[in-house]
């Protein structure tokens, strides 16, 4: 019953909206921690609660506890303090009880209290136990507009950020205070605090068009809390990577990380875009491949020829030494070579591309458990 009450497919976002209204009324200071538009927050929180209640119903606690601990650590960047968790507990309990008043009894009350004690207790405890700063700031030192919709942004951080190659971090830009976006570093962690991001302007988006169109050297960004677990097991066999556009970033970070060792599994990277000119990082990939024989790179574009606007941006024609450029959609191009079932498979890019590529590989016979990708939005 608790799960159904918060399920967005069953109208649960209305309850979440009521919860936030009550929370802000109980604790006025909380409202200033969130962006003005909370529509996306309602959806995300509704989905998270639905999953958490479902896991508890099925008596699975390990993943929910890990998720809640990460959530608690992550909320430190918003300025959430211990007192906010107590007001959150009160608001959520009161909202659930009001929503389910017709069915509320002692058993449901005990269940709700136990669940909320777990949810909020784990978050509060994890946040309190975290010793490091909740975020680190950095200065944009270089901006390269490598295509009409893509920018490469390099920053110098005030202090090094702890993350692993292949992870993504939350980023806040000065034009959009209190709004955080996930971006994947395109390089392994640097002891001197250098970091690089590849950003594509998404039509209808708020933050990515600003980053691509308005970012200037000297801008101050705020970064926090790495997430994600994409990785390469150097003893786990050869590797297939499929990167769509700026989805290249975390895969390139993993490739660069592998260059620390002399012996590695073979890695075959398919790097795709709409047009040849959007394969913006081919020169870097060629440089890495020329010095590391375990790396193969296949450039792929949906269209064979570039549009007229390509003349305004750097030439990224594949240099000699890379595989022949291929035309087509990534799922079809990748799977025409087989199912790659003997490989560790990593896919990164837009949700539609990731889903289509994963489904195509599984349909060909690739084991689903061998496929890694970050959580899909939407």
Label for each model-derived stretch:
Residues 1-136:
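Core of compact, soluble alpha-helical bundle domains
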Residues 132-220, 237-238, 273-274, 300-304:
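Ferredoxin-reductase
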Residues 241-242, 246-261:
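Phosphate-binding glycine-rich loops and their immediate beta-loop-alpha structural context
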